[in-house]
Amino acid sequence: MANLQERLTDIIRPAVEALEFELWGVEFIRAGKFSTLRVYIDHPEGISVDNCADVSYQVSSLLDVEDPINVEYNLEVSSPGMERPFFNAQQMQPYINETVAFELVAAQKNKRKFKAELIAVEGEELTLAVDNDTLQVNMRDVKNAHLVPAFD
């Protein structure tokens, strides 16, 4: 059986796409009594508070019926924002030559958390420039990654 995040993504995606938004990603954070389901949506024209409210209403109704989560949780719907988290390698493709913050499952070259310039994305393989060195990382080895906005 798929893990909870994959199951939630499969349940939520059709509702988000029916409202003509892209499902950027889903996070379920367990924190004792205060678990949170975070749904990130995107659209080429941006995301408004009303868009988030519409998606929240649809997703909430759907999850009430499907009931995939067996603990109390808060539902949050938002855009990925300027520090957008990356849930898969394909999402990184438009951000080549940008700075991305990474947290790896296990250290590579004595680094587990670092910022790097994204040089290339080929399938699940990422090529990164870190401290005047090049690092190859497979997306399955990435625990978390998010864009680091440049303020020029």
From Swiss-Prot:
GO terms for biological process: ribosomal small subunit assembly; translation. Transmembrane segments: none annotated. It is found in: Cytoplasm. InterPro entries: Ribosome_maturation_RimP, RimP_C, RimP_C_sf, RimP_N, RimP_N_sf. It comes from the Bacteria. Its main location: cytoplasm. It holds the Pfam family RimP_N. The keyword Cytoplasm applies. SUPFAM superfamilies: YhbC-like, C-terminal domain, YhbC-like, N-terminal domain. Belongs to the RimP family. This is Ribosome maturation factor RimP. It comes from Idiomarina loihiensis (strain ATCC BAA-735 / DSM 15497 / L2-TR).
